[in-house]
Amino acid sequence: MEDFVRQCFNPMIVELAEKAMKEYGEDPKIETNKFAAICTHLEVCFMYSDFHFIDERGESIIVESGDPNALLKHRFEIIEGRDRTMAWTVVNSICNTTGVEKPKFLPDLYDYKENRFIEIGVTRREVHIYYLEKANKIKSEKTHIHIFSFTGEEMATKADYTLDEESRARIKTRLFTIRQEMASRGLWDSFRQSERGEETIEERFEITGTMRRLADQSLPPNFSSLENFRAYVDGFEPNGCIEGKLSQMSKEVNARIEPFLKTTPRPLRLPDGPPCSQRSKFLLMDALKLSIENPSHEGEGIPLYDAIKCMKTFFGWKEPNIIKPHEKGINPNYLLVWKQVLAELQDIENEEKIPKTKNMKKTSQLKWALGENMAPEKVDFEDCKDVSDLKQYDSDEPEPRSLASWIQSEFNKACELTDSSWIELDEIGEDVAPIEHIASMRRNYFTAEVSHCRATEYIMKGVYINTALLNASCAAMDDFQLIPMISKCRTKEGRRKTNLYGFIIKGRSHLRNDTDVVNFVSMEFSLTDPRLEPHKWEKYCVLEIGDMLLRTAIGQVSRPMFLYVRTNGTSKIKMKWGMEMRRCLLQSLQQIESMIEAESSVKEKDMTKEFFESKSETWPIGESPKGVEEGSIGKVCRTLLAKSVFNSLYASPQLEGFSAESRRLLLIVQALGDNLEPGTFDLGGLYEAIEECLINDPWVLLNASWFNSFLTHALR
């Protein structure tokens, strides 16, 4: 049948029929009878309109050939065969210019002589049965119905056949020929029996009573009735031409669509100012761990016990001193806080039984560092509403900061492999279905690529710190509890390892609302000298607290050990998300999975194994000033994971805004790359929306600079 259709009908008709079927998700190769029926219907519509014109006097005439210069207008507007968007646009335009009532369903033709829409039917059954089904479906007095059959019968509204005898005879002859051609190939019986009746289900519920009144009350402005609004919505098809849509939406909108060319976009303007500073809740690439392997001490797994054990592995402690003060803080207090921690840990060891938790003495330095009694006193509004000069604090605008190189280094480091594994493969039961087998295989491959990644260490560190802090905030609201910063991993040889990064002391934490803040002081070990990039450490006071012997190629060297101390704060909602940082693994796995799916659908088989095991293939990882960076599939996994982790570590309103707004510009640039000839209006407004998010956040500034690299290369 498919071959017959392609031989029997004009290629333009065949192409239109294929498009129509695809629009409704149907396959011409499978539903061949439907394919033939659509082609037949299209051909009848075109034959109905052929040769019929209206002359300058408004008379209907038939012209088969003749003076091409005669001022003739086609008598029929063909609606059938256009895509839905365009078809509704034509119908709306006809209704607006002629005042004809808008039909509920798309008709096939419009007759400019009789000023009416026409619904054409071609049936393999009895014409009167089909006529009644059509009439019952469209329920419109105004639309004229004209039915033809393959046996030469016809039926039309009020027996008004619109066309002259000869034109209709041409159509009937063509239908009869199609029937004979099908019969001679043995296709007719199947075609005749495959016709289904028109859907006669009422497409609209009648709304009455209270619901009707509510509907009328809740109409958008400028709509007089529900019918009026419905007709507008039915005719409003997405992805049409933008100007038309805008003018349909509002009379006030007057947008000029500007073509978006390779020369149109400019780079994003990054702010000037001092370099941006580190703002994560804990150190990332600069962190130093004191570790114990195969821990088996008494109380193993109790954080305080583990922390003391880790501290004992280090012998190079010395009298601490400040080497990089905090600009605004009382630096001696930070020094005293560290000394207090050392002293109180010593006290614990002197006790007979080590307690499971340690609450610090509320010394003046700790009260200062944790902002105790600093919050202005809350007063009931009733008591102060008569105060004449009651006003909110003036808050300063954030100072713009420029992009600094350290954030790119942080990101690069997060993509690297460490020599330990940070996640265990969960024990999941046997696979039952084949899809589970594929899912397990993908998960195992992905885990193998990211389990040793530094970003995965950050996830586990973040989960631990946030869980411990939230627990302490709820369990010891008034106490200044000491919380060790701990993580656990496995070495290459499979030995368990417990690591201590430093300590947190939390302040008072009566957290009623999700956004109520708990203050904490963090003290973290590091080998990084803060004087190398002082701008990165603006918010920290850094002490030198010891000397560490390191094994290197040239033997042992001694390096100073630093303690990075700062006051910080977080909230219940931030801690909740911090505890769920493992989701980053899932997000990046899903991104990889969509890449595998794309590959599999091209090859029409599951490509998981080939995808992960192909050593030769490289994949695009990201943009840099040098061009598109490429790497192995493992590198892609780790880069996607690092992006997801940094989105969590550096979450902020600036990032939310930048991601949402820059995505719109990205889609336009991609459309240009796909030769879709995008057009824009108010591109300046879009740039403004993106650039107002570029203030001082290191991760947002880095993403903006990547975006500029992408623009440069995408527009070459």
UniProtKB/Swiss-Prot annotation:
Protein origin, superkingdom? Viruses
Q: Name one GO biological process term.
A: viral translational frameshifting
The free-text cofactor remark is: Binds 2 manganese ions per subunit.
The UniProt record lists the EC number as 3.1.-.-
Q: Where is this motif: Nuclear localization signal 1 (NLS1)?
A: 124-139
Q: Which UniProt keywords apply?
A: Cap snatching, Endonuclease, Eukaryotic host gene expression shutoff by virus, Eukaryotic host transcription shutoff by virus, Host cytoplasm, Host gene expression shutoff by virus, Host nucleus, Host-virus interaction, Hydrolase, Inhibition of host RNA polymerase II by virus, Manganese, Metal-binding, Nuclease, Phosphoprotein
| MF annotations from Gene Ontology | endonuclease activity; metal ion binding; RNA binding
Any one GO CC term of this protein is: host cell nucleus
Disulfide bridges in this chain? none
State where Mn(2+) 1 binds.
H41, D108, E119, I120
Q: Where is this motif: Nuclear localization signal 2 (NLS2)?
A: 184-247
Quaternary state and partners of this protein? Influenza RNA polymerase is composed of three subunits: PB1, PB2 and PA. Interacts (via C-terminus) with PB1 (via N-terminus).
Q: What does this protein do?
A: Plays an essential role in viral RNA transcription and replication by forming the heterotrimeric polymerase complex together with PB1 and PB2 subunits. The complex transcribes viral mRNAs by using a unique mechanism called cap-snatching. It consists in the hijacking and cleavage of host capped pre-mRNAs. These short capped RNAs are then used as primers for viral mRNAs. The PB2 subunit is responsible for the binding of the 5' cap of cellular pre-mRNAs which are subsequently cleaved after 10-13 nucleotides by the PA subunit that carries the endonuclease activity.
The entry's family comment says:
Belongs to the influenza viruses PA family.
* Full protein name: Polymerase acidic protein
Question: From which organism does this entry originate?
Answer: Influenza A virus (strain A/Guinea fowl/Hong Kong/38/2002 H5N1 genotype X0)
Q: Which gene encodes it?
A: PA
